[in-house]
Amino acid sequence: MLSNPKRTRFRKQHRGRMRGISCRGNHISFGRYALQALEPAWITARQIEAGRRAMTRYARRGGKIWVRIFPDKPVTVRPTETRMGSGKGSPEYWVSVVKPGRILYEMSGVSETVARTAILIAASKMPIPTQFVITG
């Protein structure tokens, strides 16, 4: 199921800039294997969910998966063929702002070959280049 915040303080947000590297969420905390972002990007809730589903499908019953990013930024879209002005568009979907170094998914309880394949399948769903990371 697509994730988005239950409630937010404001309906709309500025786009902002993605400068520098990730200073938080860049170490493996829960699992043994992880997928790490190498470039900055907005990752949509759909992409996060697609990656999670791909990993759980491949790992079957074995292993545990942690999703380390959450889509908390609303992206507004204006209706097509609308003239300029008359305010900002309405929130259409949610994204997670990801900087280089950020851990996207973590996994444990499976062999390294299974984890590597599952994480590579999830990586193919991501809009950015990523790398497979192991603790230790």
Curated annotation (Swiss-Prot):
UniProt-listed GO biological process terms: mitochondrial translation
InterPro entries registered for this protein in UniProt: Ribosomal_uL16 (IPR047873), Ribosomal_uL16_bact-type (IPR000114), Ribosomal_uL16_CS (IPR020798), Ribosomal_uL16_dom (IPR016180), Ribosomal_uL16_sf (IPR036920)
Localization in the cell: Plastid, Chloroplast
Any one annotated GO CC term: mitochondrial large ribosomal subunit
GO MF, any single term: structural constituent of ribosome
Keywords per UniProt: Chloroplast, Plastid, Ribonucleoprotein, Ribosomal protein
Assigned protein family: Belongs to the universal ribosomal protein uL16 family.
Subunit and interaction comment: Part of the 50S ribosomal subunit.
Protein name, entry field: Large ribosomal subunit protein uL16c
